[in-house]
Amino acid sequence: MSRVAKNPVAIPAGVEVKFGAADVTVKGALGSLSTALCNDVEVKLDNGQLTFAAKNDSKFARAMSGTLRALLNNMVNGVSKGFEKKLQLVGVGYRAQAQGDTLNLSLGFSHPVAHKMPAGIKVETPTQTEILVKGADKQLVGQVAAEIRAYRSPEPYKGKGVRYADEVVVLKETKKK
C-alpha cells in the first residue's frame, strides 16, 4: 500500500461526498468538484473519513491509491477552504487590473493583455502590482497562475516580469569588459 494512501482524509463539517458509478463528487461552501475513480482502488466513507486501499497488489493499484487520496484531499480542502496563488509584477509600468472575470495586464508590450478567467476562478488585484488567483480546484488555480506568469516570465538580468510571490529569481551577472 502507498504511504500516502495509509492516511485517511477527514471530511470537515459542511462538506458532502457522493459516490457515482465511476466518479466521486465533493460539495462544499466554495463549490462542487468531481473526479473519476480508478477501478483498482477501493474508497470507503465511514465515520467522516475517507479510507483508500488497493484492490490488488499490483504496482499500478498501489500507486493509484496514493494518487486518488491526494486528489480527494485537495478536493475536500478546496471546497472547504479554497486555494490561492499570489503573483507579483516587477518592472517599470507593469500594471494589473481585475474587471469581472477578466484580468487586464500592461506588461511592456505594444498592446494590453486581457486574460479571461475560466469558470470557478476568481482574480483580485489588491494593488496594481499584485495579483491573487483564488478557486476551489488546486490544479486549475495553479494552471491559471502559470498562464499569467507565462506572458512575461522573470528575465535573468534585472528580474523584470511576472513572478510568484514566494519565487526567488537568481540574477545573472552582466558581461564585464
Swiss-Prot record:
The keyword rRNA-binding applies. SUPFAM superfamilies: Ribosomal protein L6 (SSF56053). GO terms for cellular component: cytosolic large ribosomal subunit. PROSITE patterns: RIBOSOMAL_L6_1. Transmembrane segments: none annotated. One of its GO terms (molecular function) is rRNA binding. Keywords: Ribonucleoprotein, Ribosomal protein, RNA-binding, rRNA-binding. The keyword rRNA-binding applies. GO terms for biological process: cytoplasmic translation. InterPro entries: Ribosomal_uL6-like (IPR000702), Ribosomal_uL6-like_a/b-dom_sf (IPR036789), Ribosomal_uL6_a/b-dom (IPR020040), Ribosomal_uL6_bac-type (IPR019906), Ribosomal_uL6_CS (IPR002358). This protein binds to the 23S rRNA, and is important in its secondary structure. It is located near the subunit interface in the base of the L7/L12 stalk, and near the tRNA binding site of the peptidyltransferase center. HAMAP family: Ribosomal_uL6_B. Belongs to the universal ribosomal protein uL6 family. Part of the 50S ribosomal subunit. PANTHER family: 60S/50S RIBOSOMAL PROTEIN L6/L9, LARGE RIBOSOMAL SUBUNIT PROTEIN UL6M. This is Large ribosomal subunit protein uL6. It comes from Chromobacterium violaceum (strain ATCC 12472 / DSM 30191 / JCM 1249 / CCUG 213 / NBRC 12614 / NCIMB 9131 / NCTC 9757 / MK). The lineage of its organism: Bacteria, Pseudomonadati, Pseudomonadota, Betaproteobacteria, Neisseriales. The gene is rplF.
